[in-house]
Swiss-Prot record:
PROSITE patterns for the chain: AA_TRNA_LIGASE_II
Gene name of the record: aspS
Name of the molecule in the record: Aspartate--tRNA ligase
Source lineage: Bacteria, Pseudomonadati, Pseudomonadota, Gammaproteobacteria, Alteromonadales
Catalytic activity annotation: tRNA(Asp) + L-aspartate + ATP = L-aspartyl-tRNA(Asp) + AMP + diphosphate
Listed GO MF terms: aspartate-tRNA ligase activity; ATP binding; nucleic acid binding
Biological function: Catalyzes the attachment of L-aspartate to tRNA(Asp) in a two-step reaction: L-aspartate is first activated by ATP to form Asp-AMP and then transferred to the acceptor end of tRNA(Asp).
One cellular-component annotation, GO: cytoplasm
Chief location bin: cytoplasm
Keywords attached to this entry: Aminoacyl-tRNA synthetase, ATP-binding, Cytoplasm, Ligase, Nucleotide-binding, Protein biosynthesis
The protein's Enzyme Commission number: 6.1.1.12
Family: Belongs to the class-II aminoacyl-tRNA synthetase family. Type 1 subfamily.
Species annotation: Pseudoalteromonas translucida (strain TAC 125)
Length: 592
């Protein structure tokens, strides 16, 4: 039915007869001539109907937007005055000689000439995907997938599938559970990742594994998260963390070079502690030059408990962010930023405008200046290297609150004030994460997952001082997004059992949930390490969008629903009975 795609035509095809298939993007009637823009997945081409054949012209006259058609025609060069430089096929047009209307279209529920709401786009996703902007994104994602497969195949990796119906294991988020009809009352879990199976493959002797695989997490959604997502999953035996990073960095660098003609350069390596200290985040956006500066030592003795309290608390932090040119911010803007950091638990935000950095305390304007001595202000200006016209923003609270609030504020102000260079790329590796972190109740949790190996520690040393353990883990960060993360895995049963005990998983629970893994670790397990990339997030960055739904053909909303199919839906009573499931409505008690 088709001899070539519309978007592939150019001047080399002049005088050739072609067969095209696609949709009518636009129609224009100019007297005796009928012009249409025909669209397929590769682009647009202009078709002209100018014929004495009454049947052809009559049929062309009925064409409307999104009619699906097949046509034949002759490629001809446009006159110089009619060349459309904004169109890749703008040097040529097709003189239509035959037309077959395959299917007509009703008036569209989407207007392709204006911005439609995301809800409407998702409800009519099959129409939304016809837009060239969307089809280009899906094609670029497909190219990224193909590139990954080629690269890993050429480097000796085997594409091996792992189960989708599996056992629930604690990996940080809630599982999606699937009831078993055969084993009534029992449930499978959809995998949050193939983590344990890929480790078992290493124990099976498949020393280089990969898989582009669907994963599932029942968690609150954001613009860059989905309940089902696609992971580029990689695992290797007999490779160090340095070697894994080197190989996967090479893959991403070559991907960007191939698909975008961008050289990312060598990725700098930053310890987790440095990332948190300077940027308040373990995924810093290095396109933004602003850094946090600690000032606890300067304010620990001031008569202002908002500063001195956290400064003298071992779990507290007092840090400042110097914003170049920020003195021009209005009081309303500062109030808005104060509300913004409140989302992250911050109770307020002090500020200091620098009118003349050479004048010390006399050159600043701040509601907290009265609590600070002239010497403290002078030292503050020197430490931050603040210049005239800058503003210094203060964060003082528990360390985690300051990091989250000031880290997020740094990102927001960087974009709002155009400090962040959005036209650049800034990759890095973040390494040396703590193995465990403590919650507000003092309970330890794994920073990554319970199968991550510590650096230079025995099992007994790990149990004796888990808070000091540094994991052999690594995250790849690009423009403030974590695009991949991995680690060296525990390959010794004693170490794995010690890690479980630290996390409060007793021996019985270890056997119930991980008995198969602990058994496998007893039979000559090789050292192994791996990494997983989020394909959706990589595609989002490649396509230059900040919404992950833009690069998924049929995504879910932030409420984890599909507006196209109305999933999830309630099953019928017979289906539930067959699974021995009853739905209990939760009673809502009103206070009287």
């Amino acid at each position: 039915m088709r001899s070539i795609y519309c978007g592939q035509l150019n001047k080399t095809h002049v005088d050739q007869e072609v067969e095209l298939c696609g949709w009518i993007n636009k129609r224009r009637d100019l007297g005796g001539l009928i012009f249409v823009d025909l669209r397929d997945r590769e682009g647009l081409v202009q078709v002209v109907f100018d014929s004495d054949i009454e049947e052809l012209m009559s049929s062309a006259n009925t064409l409307r937007q999104e009619f699906c058609v097949q046509l034949k025609g002759i490629v001809r060069a446009r006159p110089d005055s009619q060349v459309n430089k904004d169109m890749p096929t703008g040097e040529i047009e097709i003189l239509g000689t035959e037309l077959n209307i395959i299917n007509r279209s009703e008036p569209l529920p989407l207007d392709f000439n204006q911005v439609n709401s995301e809800e409407r786009r998702l409800k009519y996703r099959y129409l939304d995907l016809r837009r060239l902007e969307m089809s280009d994104r899906i094609k670029l994602r497909a190219k990224a997938s193909s590139f990954v497969r080629r690269f890993l195949d050429e480097n000796g990796f085997l594409d091996i599938e792992t189960p989708v119906l599996t056992k629930a294991t604690p990996e940080g988020a809630r599982d999606y559970l699937v009831p078993s009809r055969v084993h009534k009352g029992s449930f499978y879990a959809l995998p949050q990742s193939p983590q344990l199976f890929k480790q078992l493959l290493m124990m099976s002797g498949f020393d280089r594994y990969y898989q582009i695989v669907k994963c599932f997490r029942d968690e609150d959604l954001r613009a860059d998260r989905q309940p089902e997502f696609t992971q580029i999953d990689i695992e290797t035996s007999f490779m160090s963390s340095d070697q894994v990073r080197g190989m996967t960095e090479k893959m991403i660098r070559e991907m960007w070079q191939t698909l975008l003609n961008v050289d990312l350069g060598d990725f700098p390596i930053m310890p987790y502690s440095e990332a948190m200290s300077l940027y308040g985040s373990d995924k810093p956006d290095l396109r933004n030059p602003m850094k946090l500066v600690d000032i606890a030592d300067l304010v620990k003795d001031v008569e202002f408990n908002v500063f001195s309290g956290p400064a003298n608390d071992e779990k507290g932090r007092v840090a400042v962010l110097t914003v170049p040119g920020g003195a021009k911010l209005s009081r309303k803007q500062l109030d808005d930023y104060t509300k913004f950091i409140g989302i992250y638990g911050a109770k307020g935000m002090a500020w200091m405008k620098v009118n003349d950095h050479t004048a010390g305390a006399e050159g600043v304007q701040s509601p907290v200046a009265k609590f600070l001595t002239a010497d403290v202000i002078t030292q503050l200006l020197e430490r931050t290297n603040a210049q005239s016209g800058d503003i210094i923003l203060f964060g003082a609270d528990k360390r985690n609150t300051v990091n989250e609030a000031m880290g997020a504020l740094r990102v927001k102000i960087g974009i709002d004030l155009e400090i962040t260079n959005l036209d650049s790329w800034a990759p890095l590796w973040v390494v040396d994460f703590p193995m465990f972190e403590e919650d507000d109740e003092g309970t330890l949790h794994a920073v990554h997952h319970p199968f991550t190996a510590p650096k230079d520690m025995s099992a007994s040393e790990l149990e004796a001082n888990p808070a000091a353990a540094i994991s052999d883990a690594y995250d790849m960060v690009l423009n403030g997004y974590e695009v991949g993360g991995g680690s060296v895995r525990i390959h010794n049963a004693d170490m794995q059992e010690a890690a479980f005990r630290i996390l409060g998983i007793n021996e019985q629970e270890q056997q119930d949930k991980f008995g198969f893994l602990l058994d496998a670790l007893k039979y000559g397990t090789p050292p192994h390490a791996g990494l997983a990339f989020g394909l959706d997030r990589l595609a989002m960055l490649l396509c230059g969008t900040d919404n992950i739904r833009d690069v998924i053909a049929f995504p879910k909303t932030t409420q984890a629903s599909c507006l196209l199919t109305n999933a999830p839906s309630k099953p019928n009573a017979d289906s539930l009975a067959e699974l021995a499931i009853s739905v209990v409505e939760k009673a809502v008690l009103s206070a009287e």
